[in-house]
């Protein structure tokens, strides 16, 4: 099994890489990361010498680079953690969020179609559901909660999710989407809540 993990030098992606290499030592894990402000190549130092790991510095928006990697590695699966992910940054510069989170996902989906990927997983965000009223502690989000975005970041993630679902419905591409809430743990980026405390 060969898995391309995009955004694998970031907080969640790197933890996923470590987990997969530990639990499935025979799997080949290919990490594709642009190494933006939130990517940290030194995080992956413990696995750099693993013969079943490969790091590729590339942008998911670069169609030629993505297709070349698919051509070289013939992946079975893609897990997309690559994203611009800070709400405040999305307010300052929404364009980069639209480019990476929507157009980058489009490039990955097209590559998955072309190369016959067995599974594509989109790591999304609970931000796509919007905000709950502070005076209603009895309310909570479920998988049936409608999308109700409230920032350029959440809108870009929701658009990517809808694109993934459209590729499933239109082309039969096997997909899954997870919408996790705030994560914390090893390799967390310093601007996030827990490291700031």
Language-model features and meaning:
Residues 184-191:
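Substrate-binding strand-loop-helix patch
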């Amino acid at each position: 099994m060969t898995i391309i993990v995009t955004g694998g030098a970031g907080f969640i992606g790197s933890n996923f890489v470590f987990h997969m290499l530990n639990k499935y030592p025979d799997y080949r894990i290919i990490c594709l990361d642009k190494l933006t402000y939130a990517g940290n190549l030194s995080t992956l130092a413990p696995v750099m010498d693993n013969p079943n790991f490969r790091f590729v510095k590339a942008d998911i928006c670069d169609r030629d680079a993505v297709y070349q990697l698919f051509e070289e590695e013939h992946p079975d699966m893609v897990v997309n953690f690559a994203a611009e992910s800070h709400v405040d940054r999305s307010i300052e510069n929404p364009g980069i969020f639209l480019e990476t989170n929507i157009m980058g996902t489009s490039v990955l989906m097209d590559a998955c179609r072309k190369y016959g990927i067995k599974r594509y997983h989109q790591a999304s965000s609970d931000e796509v559901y919007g905000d709950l009223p502070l005076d209603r502690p009895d309310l909570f989000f479920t998988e049936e909660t409608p999308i109700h975005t409230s920032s350029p970041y959440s809108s870009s993630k929701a658009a990517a999710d809808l694109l993934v679902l459209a590729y499933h419905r239109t082309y039969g591409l096997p997909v899954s989407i997870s919408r996790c809430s705030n994560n914390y743990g090893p390799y967390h980026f310093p601007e996030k809540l827990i490291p700031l405390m």
